[in-house]
Amino acid sequence: MRHIRLLPLFIFIALCLLPTNSNASATLPKLDLTVLDSCIAVKRQTNARYEQRLANMKQQLSYAKKDHAKRSRLLYELYQSYSSYQFDSALVYIKKCQEEAEESHDAHQMEKIQLNKALLLAYGGFYNNAEEIIKSVDYNRLPDDLRYDYAIAAYWTYVFWSAFTMDNEFSKSMDSLRTRYLDIAIQYSQKGSANWYYLMGEKSYFMEEDPAKTVTWYLEVLRRERTYGRLMSQAAFAAARSYKMMHNDLKYGQYLILSAKSDLLGPVKE
């Protein structure tokens, strides 16, 4: 399973900011890492508040045993809350969502849950299982609101799978599928939203456009996304990547720190 842990991220930041030679040490800008110290100091309290929020939702769920609509909503909220926090718990709740949808014979919700499960499995590193679900869904029969869910699940599946296989013939086919589903996701994403800007940044990056252009998309995400979590972390990391390509060490370090800060202060564990 592919887990993203905080400690490797901190190590990665430290290594990336180290000068590679004596000349570099004279020019490499100094970065204030104390912001991460303060974030680490409050991480336990942040997690405690988030755990309390989860506990409150579970309590509400226990009072809604016969209210299928409310149960469906709460189960889905719990799945979403766990999706970047604890993979195993997210998997438990996506299965409960599936059972609830089947019990209420809600075909639309069943397909939505299936696609969300594929996305979750992709994030967890189960690429083949995610692809099996995606291929089991008839895209041509989906309404527009589920076509986005389909495309984004497929996109991330092939992004992660391609990165896992590294540079070989299999990776090339994954890259082709990644591009195809990215275009579809952009088509059905809400234009002008933080998520749409992020996807446009991804397209610019994979098309190998000028990083000065690519980074503008990610900066638009950060102007719109004010909640610490996965999207902010990903956008900040992608912005840092662009600045590294532009040889802007100061901005590179600043956005890596922002990415780590978002991981620490948001519900991001895996």
Regions flagged by a language model, labelled:
Residues 1-9:
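Bacterial N-terminal signal peptides that target proteins for export
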